[in-house]
Curated annotation (Swiss-Prot):
Upper classification of the organism: Bacteria, Pseudomonadati, Pseudomonadota, Gammaproteobacteria, Enterobacterales
Enzyme category, top tier: hydrolase
Record's keyword annotation contains Hydrolase: yes
Keywords of this entry: Hydrolase
NCBIfam families: PRK11031.1
Name of the gene this protein is made from: gppA
Gene3D superfamilies per record: 3.30.420.40, Exopolyphosphatase. Domain 2, Hypothetical protein af1432
Family: Belongs to the GppA/Ppx family. GppA subfamily.
UniProt source species: Salmonella heidelberg (strain SL476)
One term of GO molecular function: guanosine-5'-triphosphate,3'-diphosphate diphosphatase activity
GO biological process entries: guanosine pentaphosphate catabolic process; guanosine tetraphosphate biosynthetic process; nucleobase-containing small molecule interconversion
Statement: the UniProt record of this protein carries the keyword Hydrolase: yes
Function statement: Catalyzes the conversion of pppGpp to ppGpp. Guanosine pentaphosphate (pppGpp) is a cytoplasmic signaling molecule which together with ppGpp controls the 'stringent response', an adaptive process that allows bacteria to respond to amino acid starvation, resulting in the coordinated regulation of numerous cellular activities.
InterPro entries from the UniProt entry: ATPase_NBD, GppA/Ppx_hydrolase, Guo-5TP_3DP_PyrP, Ppx_GppA_C, Ppx_GppA_N, PyroPPase_GppA_Ppx
Domain of life: Bacteria
Protein name: Guanosine-5'-triphosphate,3'-diphosphate pyrophosphatase
């Protein structure tokens, strides 16, 4: 591989050190290596902000691992940044001097504002959804809060609180008592209060979280079959579960990994304070953050206004999808959706996911015609899809799995991006759009009227269409039968 197409970003965080190595290909990035080590640097800071020798050694040990991988990458294509703990440590110079010797490249201690800006850029490049957003990143020793529209930030804040420092301060006795949480939340709200008005003034339509705490919450909710949106009610529920466990070493929540458990209660307390102080309705997980911001900054790539569209285009190119056919199916599905939207009340994000499934429905053919829906579902489940959340990927895979043949109803109910009933409705529209666009020509798609009454669909075709299209009639009869097996009434006229 040509090393000039390789880029590396290293983030010396207060809780973990991370390395991301990517390859630039045709304006998009392909992840080659992700290495993360829990160093817990912030735990080595004493009251005088002096970093202990043990903490520094843990950091250097990790960097020796990273250094081996960096040897293959040109130095101008490597960026190493240090964040909150090394901003605070009075002896940071000693740590950084040795770190630079180990890595063989400069280490830059970035300001809190620069960290917030880079986090926002990482989110803007990798996360779909509404343009106007609030980004929250809870680190080990600092928390970044950024508002912005598209690629532009409107306010940037880096606050001195993090999951490691709050752990040492409010959970040092390792008790998960109500009082510990109350103290941690009150302190976090006190830190937030001076910046809350400005954040609210700029406003947001969506809120995304870009930290280990939010990742842990996402994993818990996926494991427990909840939908992926983080809400204050869910956070309070998890806090009560943690309090029931009593002690940090006994903390057990389905979906919470051992690796994340130590700083989970402190991160949870900070997040509850943020939700409460800023009156956040819901939050989803960001697709990227600081390291992605560093990489895209080195590549000088503009923020694509529609990340999901860019992702779909890249995948269609990679798997040689017939885009004309994909657009034909999407247009038909959209037409069907408009005809039933008053009866079914399908939200804009569900519409977008249906149209995404239309664009990707034939990627399984790149493996083999036989079992193409299974191949398509497998590919979507395992591909990197910037702009789509893990739950949205699961829904797309489920729709593609059920694009034809008998319906696997349980798979539609196991995804958690949309309610099961909505997943069923999207699946029905996708199947009908694929069926009627099957001859791959616009002039051969009949005029179809679709009406919905509760779950009953009535499909009306031009008068003599069925008589003149015996194969088409057979396919429609078969589809009607498959839908009836799962109690989806389809009446064809």
């Amino acid at each position: 591989m040509n090393s000039t197409s390789l880029y590396a970003a290293i983030d010396l965080g207060s809780n973990s050190f991370h390395m991301l190595v990517v390859r630039e290909a045709a304006g998009s990035i392909q992840t080659l290596t992700r290495i993360k080590r829990k160093v817990r640097l912030a735990a080595g800071l004493n009251n005088d902000n002096h970093l202990s020798a043990e903490a520094m050694e843990r950091g250097w040990q990790c960097l020796r691992l990273f250094a081996e991988r960096l040897q293959d990458i040109p130095q101008p294509q490597i960026r190493v940044v240090a964040t909150a703990t090394l901003r605070l440590a009075v002896n940071a110079g000693e740590f950084i001097a040795k770190a630079q010797t180990i890595l063989g490249c400069p280490v830059q201690v970035i300001s809190g504002e620069e960290e917030a800006r880079l986090i926002y850029q990482g989110v803007a490049h990798t996360t779909g959804g509404a343009d106007q957003r609030l980004v929250v990143d809870i680190g080990g020793a600092s928390t970044e809060l950024v508002t912005g529209t598209g690629a532009q930030t409107t306010s940037l804040f880096s606050l001195s609180m993090g999951c490691v420092t709050w752990l040492e301060r409010y959970f040092s006795d390792r008790n998960l008592a109500q009082e510990n949480f109350d103290d941690a939340e009150k302190a976090a709200r006190d830190v937030l209060r001076p910046v809350a008005d400005e954040l609210r003034f700029h406003g947001w339509k969506v809120c995304v979280g870009a930290s280990g705490t939010v990742q842990a919450l996402q994993e818990i909710m996926m494991a427990q079959g909840m939908d992926e949106r983080i809400t204050l009610a869910k956070l309070q529920q998890l806090k009560q579960r943690a309090i029931q466990c009593g002690r940090l070493e006994e903390l057990e929540i389905e979906g919470l990994t051992l690796e994340r458990a130590l700083v989970f209660p402190s991160g949870l307390a900070i997040l509850i304070a943020i939700f409460t102080e800023l009156n956040i309705q819901s939050m989803t997980l960001a697709g990227g953050a600081l390291r992605e911001g560093l990489v895209y900054g080195m590549l000088h790539l503009a923020v694509d206004q529609d990340i999901r569209s860019r992702t779909l285009r890249n995948i269609q190119r990679r798997f040689i999808v017939d885009t004309e056919q994909a657009n034909r199916v999407a247009k038909l599905a959209d037409n069907f959706l408009k005809q039933v939207e008053n009866a079914w009340h399908i939200e804009p994000i569900s519409r977008e996911l249906l149209l995404s499934a239309c664009q990707l429905h034939e990627i399984g053919l790149s493996v083999d015609f036989k079992q193409a829906p299974y191949h398509a579902a497998y590919l979507v489940r395992h591909l990197d899809l910037p702009g789509y959340t893990p739950a949205q990927k699961k829904l797309l895979a489920t729709l593609l799995l059920n694009q034809t043949n008998p319906v696997d109803l349980s798979s539609l109910h196991q995804q958690n991006a949309v309610p099961p009933r909505v997943a069923e409705q999207l699946c029905r529209l996708l199947r009908l759009a694929i069926l009627f666009a099957g001859r791959r020509r616009d002039d051969l798609v009949p005029e179809i009227t679709l009406q919905a009454l509760n779950e009953n669909l009535t499909l009306t075709l031009p008068g003599d269409w069925l008589a003149h299209h015996p194969l088409g009639k057979e396919l429609i009869d078969q589809e009607s039968q498959w839908q009836s097996y799962v109690h989806w009434p389809l009446d064809v006229r």
